[in-house]
Amino acid sequence: LSAIPDTPAAAGWRWAPAWVLAFVALWPAPGYAEAVMVLGALAAIARLLLLRFRGGMRLLSGPAWALTSVLFCSYWLPELLSAFDAVDRARALREAAVDLRYLPFLWLVAAAVADARGRRITFGGLGAIVALWTVDALAQALTGTSPLFWGIDGIKQALSGHPMCAVGEAARVDRLSGVLGPCNLKLGIVLASLSPFALYAAARRFGSVGWLLAAAAVGVVVLLAGARAAWLTYGLVLLLSGWRVLGWKRLLGVFVFGALALGLLAATVPQLRERLARTAYALSADQDGVDLALSGRTRIWGAALCMARAHPLNGVGARGFRDAFPACDPVPTQPAAWGTGPALHAHQIVLEILSETGVLGLLCWLAGVALAWRAWRYADAPARARARPALLALGVTVFPLNTHLAFYSTFWGGLTLLLAALYAGSLLARDSDPGAAAS
């Protein structure tokens, strides 16, 4: 499909990058981020209605519209199909209906990176957010306080009289929490998933030295944030972005330096040392040792397999894991490593999809992966260069040989869909921009 030339009618979408950056920047205040996303979705719908959909080609190329919509459907259709006989059918149907709000917002996200100006603002802005959050977390590591979270918490208390986090939650924190705060310990995995935007921006502006400095700063924060899934995610980012900037030999030196830095941090940070010691239990042949190393996840995965066997076609329903867990708990009489109450989700993308949406859901996800890869395979070199940061961020986020946050949750599902739309919009952009090549 050929794109209709740009006209002044499309100028209103110059604000699309601002919607995307505001959504991400407000993640420390989830309610406000959700409001920005909903308003962005409404703005997208209004814009399309005003143009009577004739302006669609001015905003996105035809293939970009199609790929963005298909990637959304590969996420949403499993949720819908699993709802009809879910453990809590009414809730599942309601959540599936509510999640339709993502589709117009994803069109807006893809439109934000549909031309060179939009990509420069959006990708550069995401890199700047990662840099700011990294500096803030390093300040917390040195002083014990996150300046950004301190400011957000002060505003919250001034407006509502209540802090962002309960006193007990703040007292129990055992890792770097940064701008997200002690009651939302996702800093490590969020920075790891978004780090390609910062690393590519640093390499493009300052060359290999910029990449090295950015990689070191983000790496220290990811380590101190304590999420071992984030360590693997960030390692993949370094591997897949670093070889293009440094070459294999120099990249090997980076990993050797990283191992030495890890040893130094472990010697000086008790919480990191404890996590490394717990991880070492995975080398034990004893199942209990492996379960301890994985913080009880083998028990959760056993329950997920039980759900998949009991509901093979369409699972127990998206977000229904916690309700179905007691019936599938392999050791219900033993105390759980995560504390009281049922496990909330499968902590692994394939098991989450199988247990909550069944084989039908897995086929939908695989179809989305296949179409995303097909688009990459047939894209030309400039298009691949444009989309490389978004593809890397999306790829490491859904990398199956890792543990994960819940993809059928508002926060992590929203982040994943955002990355998918950034990938589709930048790969199949309206322009042909060889100058966008990443380093």
Walk through the language-model features, giving the residues of each:
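Membrane-embedded alpha-helical segments of multi-pass membrane proteins
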Residues: 30-50, 96-107, 186-195, 231-239, ...
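Hydrophobic transmembrane alpha-helices and their immediate junctions
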Residues: 128, 356-397
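Long extracytoplasmic/lumenal interhelical loops at the membrane interface
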Residues: 288-302, 314-357
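Transmembrane signal-anchor hairpin modules in multi-pass inner-membrane enzymes, especially those
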Residues: 1-94, 111-124, 128, 153-154, ...
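Transmembrane alpha-helices of multi-pass inner-membrane enzymes
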Residues: 39-47, 238, 365-371, 390-402, ...
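Alpha-helical transmembrane segments of multi-pass inner-membrane proteins
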Residues: 19-21, 43, 104, 120-246, ...
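A membrane-periplasm/extracellular boundary helix in multi-pass inner-membrane enzymes
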Residues: 135, 139-144, 224-225, 242-293, ...
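Membrane-interface catalytic loops of GT-C/OST-like multi-pass glycosylation enzymes that act
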Residues: 90-94, 181-185, 225-230, 343-348, ...
